[in-house]
Amino acid sequence: MKKYIIELIGTFFLVLIIGLTENPIAIGLGLAVLVYMGAHISGAHYNPVVTLAMYINDQIDLKESCKYIASQLTGSVVAVYTMIELGQDSFSVVSKTTEIQSFFVAEILFTFLLVFVILNVALNKSLKGNQFYGLAIGLTVTAGAFSVGDISGAVFNPAVSFGPSLLSFIDPQVVGSNISSSDFFVYFLITGIIGSVLASFLYKKVFK
């Protein structure tokens, strides 16, 4: 049970930080802190595509993966409602001028990078016991946010888009982008899965 609570709490604060600030440094450092907080309990996934990568690399079974993802999505929804209570009435992720093709390329590339970094710093035997894993993961998100934040919103995490997408069915203004509310979560899910699967199989077949 502790693992699922940590996944919910970690995802909650990650989504909350992203929703309340667009500063890539704050987001990256926030993620790093959350990773250090939960790594020894749940592995600190906070991201369905990270859980998918761990499943592909035999670190977690299917039943456990589903429970992790349910916890992450719940944390996302609670975070969005908390943002509203704090006065944040919109969640603008994708630029209204972004082309869908550019969005897909940006999200796939940097989701791949994020998952590949996580697999290497968390699973690689030569780096076992390292203390920089949290910073490596957080700084990867920071680099991605600076690089493609204006193109895709630099989400790299379907859980981050799940809460706003669900709420946007109630109020379409919650998500400020050129992507319709019905497609918002689906697009991030597709790009996340593609990036994660590519990184996972490359790591498993070549670098593990």
Q: Where do the protein language model's features map onto the residues?
A:
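Membrane-interface helix-loop junctions and terminal tails of multi-pass membrane proteins
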Residues: M1-K208
